Amino acid sequence: MRPENYQARSQPPSNEFELNFGPNHPGIEGNYAFRVKLNGDQVLEARADAGYLHRGFEKLMEGRLWIQNIALVPRICVPDPVPMEVCYSLAIEEIGGLEVPERAKWIRVMQLEMSRLAAHLFAFGGHAATTGMYTTMFWGVADRDLILDRFEELTGGRVYSIYNIPGGVRRDVPEGFLDRLSSLLDYLESRLPDYDNLFFTNQVFVKRARGVGAMTQEQALKWGVTGPNLRATGLEFDVRRDDPYLVYDQLDFEIPTESGGDALARNLVRRAELKQSIRILRQVIERLPSIEGPIRCPIPNPLAWNVPAGEAYTRVESSKGELAYYVVSTGGDKPYRVHVRGPSSMHAVQVLEKLALGARLEDIAQIMFSLDACPPEVDR
């Protein structure tokens, strides 16, 4: 090789290069892509690349009857589909002036907290896998499957229950279901110390997660962070308590918080929420047998139901953060507009991009899993 073709000593080769995560990658949650520019193993630039799961949910809802969308909305967030059903139903009930029976409200709360338990177990498993702790992942999936068994008994569906409808729920609680749910809660509570020893207090995990993906409370509020990710910065805000819906104002529960604002704090908040969801479910199990009455209010023929003209903005607390629906009716048998304000829209795009800056390449996966984002919710 000629000497003039050699690179000058004053211009050493650059260590900067670009790397694509996903859309199929073990460190990515779901079909999602993340593009980073690196200097060695340090992230200089980060850009979320969504769209791999785009199915146009919001537009599809405009062409379907009000009742038909109940089968569509759970698919917006597969790990935690129940809040999607409930929030959409609450919006229709507000526009249509429907009064949901008391028993149906308690059943909805029961289903919401069961879904929260299942979603958090799923999140723990995914995060544990990014740090090589596959036993925690297997435990989380196995224990989540027991909750799905109860969903199947209650609703007929393990993942997509399609159980909540405008005006109430499809059917009542099966005989003996509350006893079986109570036994499951006893089992799950007995498992929490095992999860603590294996994962949450494991020094390998603690050292890997502490200080990773940290944000302050001011940053979290500026970036639109909600749910466990916001509470991990020390702000005690939860829609269930601060803007109560259904019967949450009749329940006794605490709002867990942490002050670290990092991946470890976010996981510890979700760990504490498991115990609070179990606490709520036990109150429902105790109260529900004494609450009699119908499980749904009368509505017109759902296949020819012209919901009165109006609009509604409703919100609930999902396992991933504040979920809201803005629904507009022009008096027809289909929605004029449905807008979903999902927490993952913020967490998986702008928050993830900002927290990745300056991080090491090996920590990108656990930053994403600690935010517990849901890609289909981004691509709605």
Where are these regions (language model features)?
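Active-site bordering "gate/hinge" segments
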Residues: 1-380
